[in-house]
Amino acid sequence: MDTLHYLYIILLTFWFSTIPVAFLTMTRFIRNRKIFVEKDLRRIHNDPIIIFQITTKSATKITVVERGIYSIIDAAIKINYSNYKISIVTEDENDRQKFDHLKNCETVMVDKKYNTNAIKKSRALQFAVENRRKNGEDTSKFWIFHMDDESYVTNQTLLSLLKFIREGKGIAAEGPIVYPLKFELANPITALAESVRPFGCYDCVSQMKNPPPIHMHGSNLLVRSDAEDLIGWNFGSTLAEDQLFGYKLYEKYGRKALGWHGGILLEQPPLNIKDHFMQRRRWILGSLQNINKFPFWHRFKIAFKLTSYFMGFVSGIASAILYIVTFMSMLPTSIQILVDQNISNPLIWAQYIISSFFPSTFPEISLKINEMASNNSIYPIDIGPISILLLFPYIMWLLSYQIGLFLNLKHFKLFSQQSVCNRKLFHELAKRKIRSLSRRTV
């Protein structure tokens, strides 16, 4: 066999492996769609203490952090919730001056001399755990809601968190994340690539409600403070600390400890291709670092997930090349046969031109065209049951992008409306700060 045949075999092996994944994806989408977003948003005043933790290198330099802080304040005012605190875990001294004046807001400075086995973000997370321990906030009375730099909270987010805590369904929970922020400024390729991530949260519902999870988001994560204090974030040099944290929670507290709160968190996609690939690189390398810390069956699931994730990209590039090469080679033959036999029916022309474009997807078509070319005869093409079966993963793939894109665009409109309110709030708080400073000066 030549190189092209080997490439076909590799691609077909990958394509067939996507069929069970597509069926599982469809099943989870159908099963979880009703609980994906929390719809019971009644305001019942049994307010627990929630600490909204934003872990960042610098809230002053990374301007989107300020947007997230004011989104919390705005949502809390609208639902009349005051039993909360915003904790900015940072390495930048300037953040104290900028945010400490805000009500219910503290700046936790990560000591440069702080020594622990954890690295990067997990080091800051562990420092925050120990800081809460010193302040007596490491009890079941407190809940921690983790956010990223660009995270944005809505009224629905807060009400969903309060409901989950009120109903006592677990000690940790996650919710859906959508990516409408700065969506219009992102590179079109990265914006499209991020469209599949909201759809992936349907799988996260099953991961959290039927643990153990083989992955967990580090943002939109609600966890009881005493549980986080016990587990900690001291996992060594891993780049995917959230994945290990989720498994350790399950290992320590069991299946019923994890749940789904259904509160939507808005975030922004990587704005350029480099950031997009660096993000994916961190996920893959982090999972590879963690894989030996999971039981055998979970190692297999993680390995399959990583392989299919990586091979999906490789297969897509290889498939595109094969489509173009095969189409360019087969199209002249198909047209010549149609011209020689004086075929004028446009449907037949369309049929054979399309079949020239899809031989790598439908091997039976490719064989028919080759035979047709040698016999110089035309007859109906039967694409076969295997080809129809292979269409299913493609349909699910397209559907996942369309649903994710719909969610991103839907919440882009919501964010545009809320950001106007947040700007008004920002200006009002700025005026109060100026008045306060003026009184002190006098």
Regions found by a protein language model. Name each.
Residues M1-Y70:
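N-proximal low-complexity "stem/linker" segments adjacent to membrane-targeting elements
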Residues T18-D47, N290, F296-K305, M328-V442:
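Juxtamembrane C-terminal module of membrane proteins
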Residues G68-N83:
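Short, acidic, metal-binding catalytic loop of nucleotide-sugar glycosyltransferases
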Residues N94-K141:
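Active-site-proximal specificity loops/subdomain of glycosyltransferases
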Residues A118-R132, S160-L239, F277-N292:
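Long helical/loop segments within the catalytic core of UDP-sugar-dependent glycosyltransferases
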Residues M147-F164:
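Acidic donor-binding/catalytic loop of UDP-sugar-dependent glycosyltransferases
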Residues L239-F245:
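Acidic donor-binding loop at a coil-to-helix junction in glycosyltransferase catalytic cores
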Residues Y247-L265:
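Catalytic donor-sugar/metal-binding loop of nucleotide-sugar-dependent glycosyltransferases
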